[in-house]
């Protein structure tokens, strides 16, 4: 199961997930000016971020929207970034947040678990219902793939639906979590966690989610730039594992803390990952 690989990476390298939500504005001007086109510049930037953080981070999350917005050339860049990480032996999460009926979901599964856009994990939105997961299950069982389902997200608007009260004094996200936990038991790895994980933002208190979802591995966004605190992020883990804590802008733009020109941006990114790990261990 792919979840066993991710669990082992967390054990060996720590729980940090590096987000490659790479916007052109994030590139140091001196670095950008070395290239004749934006796509080559961003790919080179991504390469150097990956190379500098590879031995100190568990995995990488690539937000597809940043690449889709650049059109066909952006999707070629997306493909090259995914391939670069996977050929190095890294684990990549494609942050695509798809969610649709089974016929369409089958095509999404094929698109993102095979071919040009193949990744190890993808993010999905389960709020159309759990039947939308059916086309992905063969990939979990037989092709070393996994998903993270949106459960309780880090944005302020998550309260509009996810936090609604139900008759049994639970909230919508609690019920969705129960379904994720139950479905996930069919795809448990040797590590005790399922290849069906959940997205839980650390901009809100943990509130027993970790205890209730014992077999669900967490993708934890919201740390740093979105306001999530280290002590809250760490509370979603179990003995330092059971989840990955994502940081994107905090790592990609770490150079701005020390060197506005960004001559050593990859070294700054590496140091940010290391400091993040130290902070999480201390608390």
Curated annotation (Swiss-Prot):
Example GO BP: 'de novo' pyrimidine nucleobase biosynthetic process
Alphabetized SUPFAM superfamilies for the sequence: Ribulose-phoshate binding barrel
Active site residues of this protein: 97
Reaction equations catalysed: orotidine 5'-phosphate + H(+) = UMP + CO2
EC number: 4.1.1.23
GO molecular function, a single term: orotidine-5'-phosphate decarboxylase activity
Pathway this chain belongs to: Pyrimidine metabolism; UMP biosynthesis via de novo pathway; UMP from orotate: step 2/2
Record's keyword terms, sorted: Decarboxylase, Lyase, Pyrimidine biosynthesis
Pfam families in alphabetical order: OMPdecase
InterPro entries per the UniProt record, alphabetical: Aldolase_TIM, OMPdecase_type-2, OMPdeCOase_dom, RibuloseP-bd_barrel
Enzyme class: lyase
Family designation: Belongs to the OMP decarboxylase family. Type 2 subfamily.
UniProt xrefs under HAMAP family: OMPdecase_type2
Protein known as: Orotidine 5'-phosphate decarboxylase
UniProt source species: Clostridium botulinum (strain Loch Maree / Type A3)
